[in-house]
């Protein structure tokens, strides 16, 4: 897949983005806002996204998640934010020209994911409605079920490996691969493929389920990753990120939220892996558009790289490369190494010298 630098769309209102400010960010740069850059590693001229047959909208629903996916005029929705976000999500879908939804997915039964889906089901006819569970003891989940049934539909729990068409894109259920008592780990994990581009939606999946998913042998490699659990340190392990190898990570979280999301530990891991980070708390609604070969990004607001990555080595002279040690072999690796140990056998070093001082030797494959 040909990777494009993030592209700002001056015509964001034509895409139906909420608000009037649009921007583009060049992650890893000097921290300055770069208006409307359009660069490609291979020299391919990117489109502005308006004519793209595929779009993925990470709707700004604050400390919650809602993702609208469109391909060839067909739509699916992954989560609906909180109950109070229902009218916002409905309005956004209407602005995008949604008249019906092929699929509605509730990643898991927490209110910040299922809450707004009742309002969506009350407004838009759907082909199918899916969830990781059939029952939950919350009013918001039961309201989702009620409005689903009022359409004459039954809520379905899909099986891993199920593949759905969405226009010329395909949507595949990768997880959860086993049963969990922790609700976050029951999140439906979806892989979306469109042409040579790929996208991964993970809900609030945490590290235990990430490890199980990696061990399942599922094809996790994706260009764009919805970073799990709003950027919490309970998600996004080195092992999982090494399997996905995303170019872009999108975090849906609220401004100054009480949980401190995204956590610095997660941002550090993403930096170490060279992932470009986009956050709804700083950028508002984020729209990824693709023609099947390239993808572009539009954001509702401006933000500098220094804001997106407050301790990014590119803007902090004191930051150092992190290394991962193997407590059994006493070797240490770059986070991108293909030979990383299991997470339980990992130890993190903040510098090369620290690892050597601890008695570890560098991996000959990744550290030259």
Give residue ranges: language-model regions.
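Compact, charge-rich alpha-helical regulatory domains located at protein termini
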Residues: 337-368
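Positively charged n-region of N-terminal signal peptides that target proteins for export
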Residues: 1-9
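Non-globular, low-confidence helical/coil segments that flank catalytic cores
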Residues: 2, 17-319, 339, 345, ...
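Residue-level signal for mature regions of secreted extracellular proteins and peptides
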Residues: 13, 330, 356-359
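Short aromatic-glycine-(Arg/Gly/Cys) micro-motifs in beta-strand/loop hairpins
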Residues: 326-342
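Bacterial N-terminal signal peptides
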Residues: 8-16
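SH3-family beta-barrel domains
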Residues: 314-330
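Hydrophilic extracytoplasmic domains
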Residues: 288, 320, 353-357
């Amino acid at each position: 897949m040909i990777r494009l630098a993030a592209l700002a769309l001056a015509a964001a209102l034509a895409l139906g983005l909420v608000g009037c400010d649009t921007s583009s960010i060049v992650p890893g740069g000097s921290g300055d806002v770069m208006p409307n850059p359009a660069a490609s590693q291979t020299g391919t001229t990117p489109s502005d996204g308006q004519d793209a047959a595929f779009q993925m909208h990470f709707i700004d629903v604050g400390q919650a998640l809602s993702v609208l996916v469109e391909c060839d005029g067909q739509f699916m929705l992954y989560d609906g934010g909180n109950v109070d976000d229902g009218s916002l999500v409905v309005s956004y879908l209407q602005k995008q020209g949604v008249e019906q939804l092929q699929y509605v997915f509730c990643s898991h039964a927490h209110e910040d994911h299922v809450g707004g889906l009742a309002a969506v089901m009350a407004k838009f006819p759907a082909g199918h409605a899916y969830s990781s569970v059939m029952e939950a003891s919350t009013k918001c989940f039961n309201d989702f079920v009620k409005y689903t049934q009022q359409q004459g539909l039954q809520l379905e729990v899909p099986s891993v490996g199920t593949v759905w068409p969405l226009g010329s894109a395909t949507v595949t259920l990768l997880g959860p691969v086993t049963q969990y008592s922790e609700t976050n780990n029951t999140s439906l994990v979806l892989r979306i493929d469109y042409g040579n581009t790929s996208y991964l939606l993970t809900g609030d999946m945490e590290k235990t389920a990430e490890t199980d998913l990696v061990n399942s042998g599922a094809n996790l490699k994706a260009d764009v990753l919805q970073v799990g659990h709003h950027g919490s340190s309970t998600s996004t392990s080195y092992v999982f990120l090494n399997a996905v190898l995303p170019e872009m990570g999108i975090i849906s979280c609220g401004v100054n939220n009480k949980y401190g999301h995204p956590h610095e530990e997660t941002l550090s891991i993403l930096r170490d892996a060279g992932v470009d980070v986009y956050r709804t708390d700083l950028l508002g609604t984020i729209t990824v558009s693709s023609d099947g070969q390239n993808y572009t990004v539009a954001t509702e607001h401006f933000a500098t790289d220094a804001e997106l990555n407050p301790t990014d080595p590119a803007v902090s002279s004191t930051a150092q490369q992190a290394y991962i040690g193997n407590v059994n072999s006493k070797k240490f690796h770059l986070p991108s190494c293909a030979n990383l140990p299991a997470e339980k056998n990992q130890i993190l070093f903040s510098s090369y010298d620290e690892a050597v001082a601890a008695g570890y030797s560098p991996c000959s494959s990744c550290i030259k």
